[in-house]
Regions:
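Iron-associated oxidoreductase/ferritin-like identity signal
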Residues: 1-161
Length: 161
């Protein structure tokens, strides 16, 4: 019974990461700034890796791996991110900040369970990735680095004209 419970919790984490991939897809489809796109794509790749890592454990414990597609909750997250992203880069990042804060809280809660050392180590590693994501997105919303990038491009094109 405990093993089934552990598999269910691992599946929940894997599904959360699969849902995050969909949200990143939605944001990336609307963000034109290369600087932001590159960073968000890196975070998307992290979430894909999390799904793969968690699925390996799920399979090892006899469970059914999670598909890399959003469930109902993930579809809602992706739709909300897509709609918000239509209002520009800052709005897209605010939506992603909410998604990453939720993911961070979920990983923090997951670490309250009694896991084997191998599983705990993996969840801690993923949580550190999530912290890095939320810190970058929060800072990007605060400092708007894409505006500096636009200004630099604009200044450079004026100098050449």
């Amino acid at each position: 019974m405990a093993e089934n419970s552990e598999v269910a919790r691992l599946r929940s984490l894997a599904q959360l990461d699969a849902d995050a991939v969909g949200a990143y897809d939605a944001a990336l489809a609307r963000i034109p700034e290369q600087l932001v796109r590159e960073r968000l794509n890196d975070f998307r790749i992290d979430h894909m890796r999390h799904v793969q890592d968690l699925n390996a454990l799920i399979s090892q414990f006899g469970g059914t791996p999670v598909d890399l597609r959003p469930d109902f909750k993930g579809a809602a997250m992706k739709s909300l991110t897509a709609m918000t992203s239509m209002m520009g880069t800052e709005a897209a990042l605010v939506a992603m900040l909410g998604n990453e804060e939720f993911t961070n809280r979920t990983y923090d809660l997951a670490l309250r369970f009694d896991w084997s050392p191998e599983v705990r180590s993996l969840i801690e590693k993923h949580r550190e990735d999530e912290r890095r994501h939320v810190l970058w997105v929060r800072e990007a919303v605060r400092t708007r680095p894409w505006e500096r990038q636009r200004a630099a491009v604009h200044d450079g094109s004026e100098a050449q004209a």
